[in-house]
């Protein structure tokens, strides 16, 4: 299920499939909600409202996402945490490293690993040069930061 789209604004080249909170997908939302609750309580202490949006991103060769933040106006203003789960083993693709601005080395997490960070942290995905890289990306929502 889900809606599939292709976006390329010179900043991003990824396939995107939105995952709706239907009965067949609820187990994903429930698992992520449990993880987000524990991590938020331990590390961030952000006010969350239980709402979550979820996409699968596909990066094929030449796929990338340049420097950006996940926070913005309108519907993007209530994002409180970005949650990225690696669906592809790192040996299945080349390139596609996750980088954070001024935060050290490029990240190449293992399949099944999840990275959680505030949506105001600038980050990017380097171009994939071989294979395909799939990630499950979620945003936990709450009152907009002030």
Language-model features, listed with the residues they occupy:
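A structural signal for short, well-ordered beta-strand segments
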Residues: 54-56, 83-85, 136-140
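Conserved short histidine dyad/triad with adjacent acidic residue
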Residues: 56-75
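Catalytic core of Fe(II)/2-oxoglutarate
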Residues: 79, 89, 93-146
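Non-heme Fe(II)/2-oxoglutarate
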Residues: 1-47
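A short coil-to-beta-strand element that immediately follows conserved catalytic motifs
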Residues: 43-54, 94
């Amino acid at each position: 299920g889900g809606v599939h789209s292709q976006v390329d604004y010179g900043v991003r080249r990824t396939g995107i499939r939105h995952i709706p909170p239907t009965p067949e997908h609820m187990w994903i939302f429930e698992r992520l909600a449990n993880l987000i609750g524990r991590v938020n309580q331990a590390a961030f202490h952000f006010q969350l409202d239980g709402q979550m949006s979820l996409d699968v991103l596909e990066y094929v060769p030449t796929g990338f996402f340049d420097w950006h933040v996940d926070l913005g106006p309108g519907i993007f203003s209530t994002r409180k945490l970005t949650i990225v789960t690696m669906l592809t083993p790192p040996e299945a693709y080349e390139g596609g490293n996750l980088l954070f601005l001024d935060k050290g080395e490029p990240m190449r997490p293992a399949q099944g690993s999840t990275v959680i960070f505030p949506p105001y942290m600038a980050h990017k995905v380097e171009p994939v040069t071989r294979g395909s890289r799939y990630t499950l990306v979620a945003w936990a929502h709450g009152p907009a930061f002030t």
